[in-house]
């Protein structure tokens, strides 16, 4: 399901944005009890889509993406995938860390492949997948599209002073 992604707004008009936003908010309210609290909170917190707020991922730049499989069990045979994305925030005063736990599937299309990177994070939607998991769709300014289906998403804002020691 898509409401506010670019493909849903062919004219990129204010009216399309308002209509899509209203439908997206209604959708999120309808799945509130089915999404994990942190995914729902991230999708509905006011600053997420307030592009003047420094914590918003909009216009952030990808600095790193890690895919790992933490293991447990006697032979490390119990595995699950997780993805961690580290963004340089749009106002260059902090970083955003997104942790996707219990990843079931993902597609990380890069878009333009001229060596110039992903560009800026444009729009994203959090929804419920057909399998009842969290689905996060992220559009990038150079045409990339990420689809990550997971158990949950954790968001952390790291002010630049703190970020220097986290790297």
Which residues are covered by each model-predicted region?
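Surface-exposed, interaction-prone regions used to assemble/regulate multi-protein complexes
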Residues: 1-167
